[in-house]
Each structure stands twice: as C-alpha cells, then as structure tokens.
C-alpha cells in the first residue's frame, strides 16, 4: 500500500508562524507594525473565534502585497526561505527526510502561501493557500480557500482521491490541523517539541 506522510508547516515544521515572519522580512519592522495595528481589531476577533480566519488573513496579505509583481514576490519568497532555514525544527526535518528515504510520498499541507513554503522544500509537494495573480501582479486575493481545517482534507482528497489506496500519516500542531489529523490513519500532534 502506498504511504503518504503529510506535515503541517507553521508550528509543526517551523518554530513560528511564517506569515508574520515573512511580512516582517519582506516589508521591514515599521511597516509590519503599522500594518498589524491597522488590522488589530479583526485579528483579536479572529483569535476569539468571532471573525473568520481566512478574511483576516486575506486583509492582512492584501495590505502588504497587493500590487506587487509576482516576480518580485517570488524573489522575496526564495530569499526568505534561504535566509530563514533556522526556523525549521530539526527533528521535524529529520522525520520528513526519513519518510522520503523510506519511500513515502511526502506532502506539506499548509495555510501558508505556497510561494514561500515551496522554497524550503525543493522536492516536496506543497498544498497551501494560493494567491491570485492578474497580468503578473498580485491582486491581494486568494485563488483558493485558505488551506485550514477541513480545507486541508479537501486538498488531500483532490490530490489523492482514492483514500482506500494509501496509508496516511499526518503531523500537526493546532486546531487548523484537527480535521487532517482525524482523517489520517496515524496522527501525531505537536510531535517535534522538545
């Protein structure tokens, strides 16, 4: 039977949320603080479960990146990954590499934007939130649903539709991974914390 090993990215394979780290890296500390202060009410309501996660995330993303060329954005993503490999949890990366060595298909299922996750893992499939680009420019909107909660399961089924044909092992660390962990044959919650 085919083996698939799915990892969440932020908090599972990394030590912090990469959306925040990426914005700070791409825009600088001052712009980062000013942008987050602008959306503080929505972010607080989101944390309290009173405002949808995807809406808050898209508003923040649009504030910082709407109008940027995809070429510039992808260059930032490449540099961010290169300069921030220290964010990766060593035990998580060892587990990922061992799964590959064992012949499993490895996939990262993340609410983060594909563009900055993929450069961390050249030879791993990434199923993340995708951004809309028109005429080479970011619109500030998401092309897909935010890959969070049930959407992680939907993405897995879209990519691997014949569930009975594979054994799924999943790693996650938050409520956004709950459905994926329940969907898996074998699940690991917060596995790489020391």
Predicted features along the sequence, with ranges:
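Metal-dependent phosphoesterase signature
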Residues: 56-91
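Short, flexible active-site loop motifs that bind/organize anionic cofactors or intermediates
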Residues: 2, 9, 63, 142-146, ...
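Short, flexible segments with low predicted structural confidence
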Residues: 27-28, 32, 44-46, 70-71, ...
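A broad detector of the eukaryotic-type serine/threonine protein kinase catalytic domain
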Residues: 24-27, 78, 143
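Active-site neighborhood of HAD-like aspartate-dependent phosphohydrolases
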Residues: 1-49
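Cysteine/selenocysteine-centered motifs that mediate thiol-based redox chemistry or coordinate metal-sulfur cofactors
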Residues: 44-56, 60
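C-terminal cap/substrate-recognition subdomain and adjoining C-terminal extension
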Residues: 75, 82-194
């Amino acid at each position: 039977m085919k083996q698939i090993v799915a990892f969440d990215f932020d908090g599972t394979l990394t030590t912090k949320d990469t959306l925040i780290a990426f914005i700070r890296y791409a825009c600088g500390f001052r712009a980062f603080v000013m942008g987050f202060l602008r959306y503080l009410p929505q972010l607080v309501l989101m944390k309290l479960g009173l405002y949808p996660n995807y809406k808050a995330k898209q508003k923040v993303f649009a504030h910082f990146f709407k109008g940027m060329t995809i070429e510039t954005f992808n260059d930032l993503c490449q540099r961010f990954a290169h300069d921030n490999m220290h964010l990766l949890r060593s035990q998580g990366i060892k587990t990922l590499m061992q799964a590959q060595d064992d012949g499993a298909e490895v996939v990262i299922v993340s609410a983060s934007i594909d563009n900055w996750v993929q450069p961390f893992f050249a030879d791993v499939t990434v199923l993340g939130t995708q951004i809309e680009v028109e005429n080479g420019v970011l619109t500030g909107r998401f092309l897909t649903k935010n890959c969070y909660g049930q959407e992680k399961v939907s993405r897995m089924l879209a990519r691997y539709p014949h569930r009975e044909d594979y054994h799924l092992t999943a790693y996650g660390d938050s409520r956004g991974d709950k459905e994926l962990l329940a969907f898996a044959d074998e699940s690991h919650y917060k596995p790489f914390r020391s």
